[in-house]
Structure formats: structure tokens, C-alpha cells
């Protein structure tokens, strides 16, 4: 008999709106014993069936919904259906944008909570972020092998969020060939190296595809500063947009080395590039003291806020770094500024940029707004899925 989780009276409203999470505070009782990650049924206080979900006893999110259809079984066929539904959309995007690298599964928004899958050529990179996802590992891999027999599968479940689920960090080859140290992918006419084994996240920031295209369009004739550059995808975009110069800044020499290789891969002019290993905050202050000026600054920092208690300090960090950037821009210069934290509301981020401009002593115009690329969809019932936000700001 399936274990049943009974909600407290009145706590079913979010599920009726098809939100995929059940928090521990919404639960009245659990009927039966369930293993971590096991599939359970969710019922309201009157015993009405609501959903079928994965049980996560170590997490504040006590259950994550697999399905709202009572007759749907969570088996290999279920995962095959979800994969095929997701692939239909990615096929269209891949053809439109000339892609052989994209996010295949975006967790809750593709009906597979806690599961992230990126495809880079014929390599599938898997992140299992929840107890339910981990419990279904073998079944999911079987579904992937059925749908993508040509692909190797590599595990990058080495992310700290797994600790909140009581899970160990895992990484390594699941099946097929070991990925090369650097694998090139195509994006809007660019070739970009992906480091599947050692790179950030799954190896590359696919979510910034549209923002890179915007940077390319703004770059013509401009002197560009690319902050938190990682492997230089924004620098490649700027050079393809015929920038005057692009300076890429990161604290890691290894990613700057890959950035240089990316520029060489695209046969672009290395004489128009500079790579600086430094702390961005310190370098911006140094540039300000030296009177350096730029026409386009790309500000794409790592996540400043991991939990709500860090939000206030993150706001200060975002304001300070964007203030410095605005001070380095010539009149008419463009700032492309981003936040990748789901805990940072878009309206608050916009206010931070406005406050940064005020502190910098300049007026700015908001001329364009960004979000994650379309292979990272946001299902209507789960607004938390919209984590990446950005603005193009013109300095007056």
C-alpha cells in the first residue's frame, strides 16, 4: 500500500494551483513508513487525493510532486514521456538558434522536480538535487538510455544543495564515453568550449544565451569590460559584435586560459583582448582611481544570496559593484547587469540598480530586460523557476 501524506486543513490551496512543493508545516500526518525519496500520495484533510510526490524527510520541502494525475504511475515510461515532452520544445529551439548544447530538463518546470539535465553534443550531464530524484536514479538513467542511445551520461550531482536532502555529493561517468577535457558546442554562430568534468554547474552557463546575443548587438565599436568572465563566452560575443577591445576579469587563471582558447577557436582577434586575474571589486576600484572608462560593462557575478538571511548583505554587494561599474562608464555607455539568485526578486534587483546609479552620481535608463534562455522555461504554477534576471542600463 502506498504511503499517504495528509495535509493540515486548508493547506491544500497551493497544490490545487499545481505548485509542486509541499512544505513540512503544511502536513498533518504521514500514514505509513516511507524511505527517503520514495513515492507517496498526497491527500487533503478530508482524504481527497491531490498528487503523487517524492518524500524528502530531511528537507523543509517535505515532498515534491511528480504528477497531479491519479492514474499516472512513476516508472520508466513516466520518465520517457516527460523526456519526450521536453525534447519537442528543445528541438525547435536548437534549430532556431543553431544549438547542439541546451538544457533538456529544467526540474520542476519540465515536470521532473530536482532533476537537471544538460545536453552538450552527445553528452548528457545529470544533476540530481533532491531525495526523490536520487531515489529514481536508475529508472531515470534507463529512460535516458532508451531515448538517447547515442549519448554518454555523466553525473555532476556534486552540488551542496544535496546536503539539505541528506544526500552525498556524487560525480562521475554513468555510461558511455568519458567527456573530453573541453568539448565545443555551437550557439548563435559561436563555438564555445564546455568543461563537463571540472567546470561550474554542469560545465557551462546555458541560461545566458540570449544575454550573450544582446552583448554582441551592443558591442560594436565599444570598449568592453567583462566582469566575472568565467570561460569568456561574453568576450567571444563582444568580439563577434566588432568591439574595440574586451577585457575579461576572473579570479581563476584556469578559466581565463579557456577564455583565450575560446577566442582562438572562433578565429577572433586576440590583440583586441586582455585577460586579468583579479578580484572584480578591487579591480573596479583600481580602474576608478586610474580614470579608466568603458562603453559596455557586463556584470554577471556568481550567486550572492543562498538563503533569505543573506538577502540584505547581497543587496549591498550588488549595489556596490554596480555603482562602481556605472562610475566607469562613459555617457551613453551600457551596463548589462545580472543576478542569478532565485531569492532576489526582479523588482528589488531593479531598485538596487537605480540606487547604485544614484550613489554613482548618474542617471540611468532601463532599456532592456533579460531572463534565462527559453530552454530554461518557467511553468506558471512555479514562479520560483524564474531565477535569472538582468537589465541593460544606459548611463545618461
UniProtKB/Swiss-Prot annotation:
Catalytic activity: cytidine(1962) in 23S rRNA + S-adenosyl-L-methionine = 5-methylcytidine(1962) in 23S rRNA + S-adenosyl-L-homocysteine + H(+)
Short name of one Pfam family: PUA_3
Keyword Repeat set for record: no
Keyword ATP-binding included in the entry's annotation: no
Leading EC class: transferase
Localization (cell): Cytoplasm
Signal sequence residues: none
PUA domain mapped to chain residues: 2-81
Family that this chain belongs to: Belongs to the methyltransferase superfamily. RlmI family.
Name of protein: Ribosomal RNA large subunit methyltransferase I
Amino acid at each position: 500500500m502506498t504511503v499517504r501524506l495528509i495535509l493540515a486543513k486548508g493547506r491544500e490551496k497551493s497544490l490545487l494551483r499545481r505548485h509542486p512543493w509541499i512544505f513540512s508545516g503544511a502536513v498533518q500526518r504521514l500514514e505509513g513508513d516511507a524511505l527517503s525519496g520514495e513515492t507517496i500520495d498526497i491527500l487533503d484533510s478530508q482524504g481527497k487525493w491531490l498528487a503523487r510526490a517524492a518524500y524528502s524527510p530531511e528537507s523543509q520541502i517535505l515532498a515534491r510532486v511528480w504528477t497531479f494525475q491519479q492514474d499516472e504511475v512513476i516508472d520508466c515510461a513516466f520518465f520517457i514521456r516527460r523526456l519526450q515532452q521536453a525534447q519537442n520544445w528543445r528541438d525547435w529551439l536548437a534549430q532556431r538558434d543553431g544549438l547542439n548544447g541546451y538544457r533538456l530538463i529544467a526540474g520542476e518546470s519540465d515536470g521532473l522536480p530536482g532533476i537537471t539535465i544538460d545536453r552538450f553534443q552527445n553528452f548528457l550531464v545529470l544533476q540530481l538535487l533532491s531525495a526523490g530524484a536520487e531515489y529514481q536514479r536508475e529508472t531515470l538513467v534507463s529512460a535516458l538510455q532508451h531515448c538517447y542511445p547515442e549519448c554518454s551520461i555523466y553525473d555532476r550531482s556534486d552540488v551542496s544543495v544535496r546536503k539539505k536532502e541528506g544526500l552525498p555529493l556524487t560525480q562521475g561517468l554513468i555510461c558511455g564515453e568519458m567527456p573530453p577535457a573541453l568539448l565545443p558546442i555551437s550557439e548563435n554562430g559561436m563555438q564555445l568550449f564546455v568543461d563537463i568534468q571540472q567546470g561550474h554547474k554542469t560545465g557551462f552557463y546555458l541560461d545566458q544565451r540570449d544575454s550573450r546575443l544582446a552583448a554582441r548587438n551592443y558591442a560594436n565599436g565599444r570598449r568592453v569590460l567583462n566582469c566575472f568572465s568565467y570561460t569568456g563566452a561574453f568576450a567571444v560575443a563582444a568580439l563577434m559584435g566588432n568591439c574595440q577591445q574586451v577585457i575579461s576579469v576572473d579570479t581563476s587563471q584556469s578559466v581565463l586560459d579557456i577564455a583565450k582558447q575560446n577566442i582562438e577557436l572562433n578565429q577572433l582577434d586576440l590583440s583586441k583582448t586582455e585577460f586579468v586575474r583579479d578580484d572584480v571589486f578591487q579591480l573596479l576600484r583600481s580602474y576608478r582611481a586610474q580614470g579608466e572608462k568603458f562603453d559596455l560593462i557586463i556584470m554577471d557575478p556568481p550567486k550572492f544570496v543562498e538563503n533569505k538571511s543573506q538577502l540584505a548583505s547581497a543587496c549591498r554587494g550588488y549595489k556596490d559593484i554596480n555603482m562602481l561599474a556605472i562610475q566607469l562608464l562613459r555617457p551613453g555607455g551600457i551596463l548589462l547587469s545580472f543576478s542569478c539568485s532565485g531569492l532576489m526578486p526582479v523588482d528589488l534587483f531593479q531598485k538596487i540598480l537605480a540606487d547604485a546609479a544614484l550613489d554613482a552620481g548618474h542617471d540611468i535608463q532601463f532599456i532592456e530586460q533579460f531572463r534565462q534562455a527559453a530552454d530554461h522555461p518557467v511553468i506558471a504554477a512555479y514562479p520560483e523557476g524564474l531565477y535569472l534576471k538582468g537589465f541593460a542600463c544606459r548611463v545618461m
